[in-house]
């Protein structure tokens, strides 16, 4: 078995000589991650370094970070924060749809209120049904 296992690494290293530099690049990657985490820690300590630490973060996540920063720099920046506040005010129902409909069409408010009332009534009916089951179960015992 020693001869077989010994012969395999020799052929493997001869065929794939790039495997060693890959391991080295991983070491540099972990070193880069360590330095990046240190910069994040420093940014948490000082508020001035936060702006400088955000720019490397955008380079690492180009799809998410650049799109969000692009939206923030445009004029619609004023409209999303009020929507977020409205979302927090709405309780459990899907917050995105009511905010859009409330702002666009006042006629749809009545429809939404009716739907919400129906949901509330359905919950009440279920609660009443459960309590009746419980009370009937207690009587039979």
Curated annotation (Swiss-Prot):
<feature type="binding site">
    <location>
        <position position="16"/>
    </location>
    <ligand>
        <name>Zn(2+)</name>
    </ligand>
</feature>
<keyword id="KW-0744">Spermatogenesis</keyword>
<feature type="modified residue" description="Phosphoserine">
    <location>
        <position position="136"/>
    </location>
</feature>
<feature type="compositionally biased region" description="Polar residues">
    <location>
        <begin position="91"/>
        <end position="106"/>
    </location>
</feature>
<keyword id="KW-0862">Zinc</keyword>
<comment type="similarity">
    <text>Belongs to the nuclear transition protein 2 family.</text>
</comment>
<dbReference type="GO" id="GO:0035092">
    <property type="term" value="P:sperm DNA condensation"/>
</dbReference>
<dbReference type="GO" id="GO:0008270">
    <property type="term" value="F:zinc ion binding"/>
</dbReference>
<dbReference type="GO" id="GO:0007340">
    <property type="term" value="P:acrosome reaction"/>
</dbReference>
<dbReference type="InterPro" id="IPR000678">
    <property type="entry name" value="TP2"/>
</dbReference>
<protein>
    <recommendedName>
        <fullName>Nuclear transition protein 2</fullName>
    </recommendedName>
</protein>
<feature type="compositionally biased region" description="Low complexity">
    <location>
        <begin position="37"/>
        <end position="55"/>
    </location>
</feature>
<keyword id="KW-0597">Phosphoprotein</keyword>
<dbReference type="Pfam" id="PF01254">
    <property type="entry name" value="TP2"/>
</dbReference>
<keyword id="KW-0539">Nucleus</keyword>
<keyword id="KW-0479">Metal-binding</keyword>
<dbReference type="GO" id="GO:0007341">
    <property type="term" value="P:penetration of zona pellucida"/>
</dbReference>
<feature type="binding site">
    <location>
        <position position="33"/>
    </location>
    <ligand>
        <name>Zn(2+)</name>
    </ligand>
</feature>
<feature type="binding site">
    <location>
        <position position="29"/>
    </location>
    <ligand>
        <name>Zn(2+)</name>
    </ligand>
</feature>
<feature type="binding site">
    <location>
        <position position="27"/>
    </location>
    <ligand>
        <name>Zn(2+)</name>
    </ligand>
</feature>
<feature type="binding site">
    <location>
        <position position="12"/>
    </location>
    <ligand>
        <name>Zn(2+)</name>
    </ligand>
</feature>
<keyword id="KW-0158">Chromosome</keyword>
<comment type="function">
    <text>Plays a key role in the replacement of histones to protamine in the elongating spermatids of mammals. In condensing spermatids, loaded onto the nucleosomes, where it promotes the recruitment and processing of protamines, which are responsible for histone eviction.</text>
</comment>
<feature type="short sequence motif" description="Nuclear localization signal">
    <location>
        <begin position="114"/>
        <end position="122"/>
    </location>
</feature>
<feature type="compositionally biased region" description="Basic residues">
    <location>
        <begin position="130"/>
        <end position="141"/>
    </location>
</feature>
<feature type="region of interest" description="Disordered">
    <location>
        <begin position="1"/>
        <end position="141"/>
    </location>
</feature>
<feature type="compositionally biased region" description="Polar residues">
    <location>
        <begin position="1"/>
        <end position="36"/>
    </location>
</feature>
<keyword id="KW-0238">DNA-binding</keyword>
<keyword id="KW-0221">Differentiation</keyword>
<dbReference type="GO" id="GO:0005730">
    <property type="term" value="C:nucleolus"/>
</dbReference>
<dbReference type="GO" id="GO:0010954">
    <property type="term" value="P:positive regulation of protein processing"/>
</dbReference>
<keyword id="KW-0217">Developmental protein</keyword>
<dbReference type="GO" id="GO:0003677">
    <property type="term" value="F:DNA binding"/>
</dbReference>
<dbReference type="GO" id="GO:0000786">
    <property type="term" value="C:nucleosome"/>
</dbReference>
<keyword id="KW-0544">Nucleosome core</keyword>
<feature type="compositionally biased region" description="Polar residues">
    <location>
        <begin position="56"/>
        <end position="77"/>
    </location>
</feature>
